[in-house]
């Protein structure tokens, strides 16, 4: 029994220590990235990402998309964004949507872009909310719908995306007072449901 307990305690300390090491490695990678020491950041992010760390996967996606410390490679960016997006990282979902919208690393597919923007927007990502507004306003991947465009621009603006407010005001000029009221109602309901004022 004593051996079993010692083994379990050792195992517990190993997991606690390794979790701490992974957290330290991630923070070291973030710090290196902020210093623009991309080669070090990449070396630290890669093993974490390969072990399934969604934040590290997202970070590698950014590095490949922007060519930071690695040659710019949109296919590789999509791979890492997708892995993080599938784990629920809102920024990964938004950036994966952006890749589909632009056709970078994947064939252009507006419907797929809308899918990922929506998942991210529902989590409160202001850029995704704005991007979803653009898709509705332009009728890309969805039927053109100024009410929905206004709704998502309004929500994005309330979450700090200045372009959301600007585009809301532009699209408003194409809408009737009843449509504007409906869009405002939908935005208000979404914000109340998601704990926003």
Regions found by a protein language model. Give the residues of each.
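Bacterial N-terminal signal peptides that target proteins for export
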Residues: 1-9
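Cleavable N-terminal signal peptides
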Residues: 10-11, 21
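Hydrophobic face of amphipathic alpha-helices that form TPR/SEL1-like repeat modules
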Residues: 25-32, 44-48, 59-66, 95-102, ...
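Terminal, low-structured helical/coil segments at or just beyond the last alpha-helical repeat
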Residues: 28, 161-197
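Short helix-capping/linker turns of helical repeat alpha-solenoids
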Residues: 32-37, 45, 50-53, 66-68, ...
């Amino acid at each position: 029994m004593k051996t079993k307990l010692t083994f379990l305690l050792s195992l517990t300390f190993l997991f606690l220590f390794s979790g701490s090491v992974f957290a330290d490695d991630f923070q070291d990678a973030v710090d290196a990235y902020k210093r623009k020491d991309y080669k070090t950041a990449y070396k630290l992010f890669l093993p974490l990402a390969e072990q399934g760390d969604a934040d590290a996967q997202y970070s590698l996606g950014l590095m490949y998309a922007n060519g930071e410390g690695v040659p710019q490679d949109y296919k590789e960016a999509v791979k890492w964004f997708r892995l993080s997006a599938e784990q629920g990282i809102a920024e990964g979902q938004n950036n994966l949507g952006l890749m589909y919208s632009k056709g970078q690393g994947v064939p252009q597919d507006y419907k797929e872009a809308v899918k990922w923007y929506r998942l991210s927007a529902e989590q409160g990502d202001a850029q995704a909310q704005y991007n979803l507004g653009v898709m509705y306003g332009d009728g890309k991947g969805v039927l053109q719908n100024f009410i929905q465009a206004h709704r998502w621009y309004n929500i994005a603006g309330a979450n700090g995306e200045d372009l959301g407010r600007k585009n809301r005001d532009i699209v408003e000029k194409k809408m009737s007072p009843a449509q504007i009221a409906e869009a405002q109602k939908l935005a208000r309901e979404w914000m109340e449901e998601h704990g926003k004022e």
